[in-house]
Regions:
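Bacterial signal peptide processing site
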Residues: 20-23
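Short amphipathic, basic-aromatic surface patches that mediate peripheral association
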Residues: 34-45
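Bacterial N-terminal signal peptides that target proteins for export
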Residues: 1-9
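Short coil-to-beta strand junction motifs in C2/discoidin
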Residues: 46-55
């Protein structure tokens, strides 16, 4: 009986914790991040689209991230950014793929640095910094295409829709 009561209480606490994490009144810092890879992303030497690896780095400050080179950020960001690095995550997108992520950001993180491992680094925008609002939900949509990674805004979408119809 005691064991059943403890398990019931743990279950209820789990439900309450889950509700707090999705509540609009939550004090967590959250990031809803949508990533879309174009059909022609990250072409190889033969012009074939290829998967692209994306690293998300939670940062206290973006300055050192913005000044570091790709290989440092990609292979040893934690060591290269000791005062700014908080956490990181890696994912891979295939050409034409879309991912929607719901992330809880660490309380000390103020920015998320995006590093996209393009094959042709000198000719693309491979780095991006996203500010995150403390104890709020930040929503961002990113597009990874032939020119690099960029924030995909509703205005850009309407403009692209208009041009597609002409």
């Amino acid at each position: 009986m005691y064991r059943a009561a403890v398990l019931s209480m743990l279950f209820v606490l789990g439900l309450l914790t889950g509700c707090a994490s999705v509540s609009p009144y939550s004090t967590l810092t959250k990031l809803d991040l949508a990533l879309s890879a174009s059909e022609g992303v990250n072409r190889d030497l033969h012009g074939r689209p290829s998967p692209i690896v994306v690293r998300l780095l939670e940062l206290r400050h973006p300055v050192a991230f913005e000044n570091a080179d790709f290989f440092t950020l990609y292979s040893r960001a934690e060591q290269a950014l000791p005062k700014d690095w908080v956490n990181s995550e890696e994912l891979e997108l295939r050409p034409g793929e879309r991912l929607a992520l719901k992330l809880s950001v660490e309380p000390q993180s103020r920015y998320v640095g995006v590093v996209a491992a393009y094959r042709d680094l000198p000719h693309v925008q491979w780095r991006l910094v996203l500010p995150v609002a403390r104890q709020r939900l930040t929503r961002v949509e990113l597009m990874l295409d032939e020119s690099g990674v960029r924030v995909f805004t509703p205005q850009a979408r309407r403009s692209e829709d208009r041009h597609a119809g002409s």
